[in-house]
């Protein structure tokens, strides 16, 4: 995944020092795009090990419309723990906006169900968009959406997805986001009778936290290995019917994990 290494190198060489909400400090660039051909392998970083279980369970949690960390904790995933309240609640974060966006007239809009039907009925639509950025709810969220809007595009029997991410923690968060949205694209392609095309990742403020710089330099010394293959149970035809057991990552041979602290 040379695209990701190029981003690390750009930030380390051209990044601007910025203050941030967490008080940690960052090196930051503004505006960056990476493209991943999903037919060329599943874009899971090989220059450090990523936890597939956490990536898959978080995505399934989003798709359930859940905003409490109980499901994640029950499945051994702790990535949202720092932001949850004493009851495990996060406020109206991703799952709520994806599955039950509150309309002004009192309706609840299921953006994911709608997008699947739109892709089936009108694949050439330029309105195949899901947004998690709801200005009316942002102040009630434990953490406002970083990956905040994505759009699908159908051409030649293939489904592509472009994600806009306003804030990108490049060392810890972005590798998760790449794998998560690549997987979501594959899942929606399967249930709409399409093949996976590209995942395009567009970043706004792309940053390395000051306590991740040495880890990024270490990662850049490692040579990328062949990408793995993601195999999805072809029997699943409902985007809300997927379970963790329906996904098998074959041929994943990464370099060892690199530890880094999350900026809260």
Swiss-Prot record:
Its EC number is 2.1.1.45. One of its GO terms (cellular component) is cytosol. GO terms for biological process: dTMP biosynthetic process; dTTP biosynthetic process; methylation. Pfam families: Thymidylat_synt (PF00303). Its main location: cytoplasm. InterPro entries: Thymidate_synth/dCMP_Mease, Thymidate_synth/dCMP_Mease_dom, Thymidate_synth/dCMP_Mease_sf, Thymidylate_synthase, Thymidylate_synthase_AS. Pathway: Pyrimidine metabolism; dTTP biosynthesis. DUMP binds at residues 21, 126-127, 166-169, 177, 207-209. Catalyzes the reductive methylation of 2'-deoxyuridine-5'-monophosphate (dUMP) to 2'-deoxythymidine-5'-monophosphate (dTMP) while utilizing 5,10-methylenetetrahydrofolate (mTHF) as the methyl donor and reductant in the reaction, yielding dihydrofolate (DHF) as a by-product. This enzymatic reaction provides an intracellular de novo source of dTMP, an essential precursor for DNA biosynthesis. Homodimer. Belongs to the thymidylate synthase family. Bacterial-type ThyA subfamily. NCBIfam families: PRK01827.1-3, PRK01827.1-5, thym_sym. This is Thymidylate synthase. It comes from Rhodopseudomonas palustris (strain BisB5). The gene is thyA.
């Amino acid at each position: 995944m040379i695209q990701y290494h190029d981003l690390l190198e750009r930030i380390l060489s051209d990044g601007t020092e910025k203050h941030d909400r967490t008080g940690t400090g960052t090196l930051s660039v503004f505006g960056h795009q990476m493209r991943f051909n999903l037919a060329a392998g599943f874009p899971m970083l090989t220059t450090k090990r990523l936890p597939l279980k956490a990536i898959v369970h978080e995505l399934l949690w989003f798709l359930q419309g859940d905003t409490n960390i109980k499901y994640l904790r029950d499945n051994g995933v702790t990535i949202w723990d720092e932001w949850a309240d004493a009851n495990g609640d996060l406020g109206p974060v991703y799952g709520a906006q994806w599955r039950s966006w509150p309309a002004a007239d009192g309706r609840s809009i299921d953006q994911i169900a709608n997008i699947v039907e739109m892709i089936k009925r009108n694949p050439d639509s330029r309105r195949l968009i899901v947004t998690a950025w709801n200005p009316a709810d942002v102040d009630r969220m434990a953490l406002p959406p970083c990956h905040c809007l994505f759009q699908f595009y159908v051409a030649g029997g293939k489904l592509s997805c472009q994600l806009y991410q306003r804030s990108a923690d490049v060392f810890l968060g972005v590798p998760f986001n790449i794998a998560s949205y690549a997987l979501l694209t594959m899942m929606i392609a399967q249930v709409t009778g399409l093949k996976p095309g590209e995942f395009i990742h567009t970043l706004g403020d792309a940053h390395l936290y000051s306590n991740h710089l040495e880890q990024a330099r270490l990662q850049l010394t490692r040579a990328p290995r062949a990408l793995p293959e993601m195999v999805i149970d072809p029997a699943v035809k409902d985007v809300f019917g997927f379970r963790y057991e329906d996904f098998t990552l074959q041929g994943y041979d990464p370099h060892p994990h690199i530890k880094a602290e999350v900026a809260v």
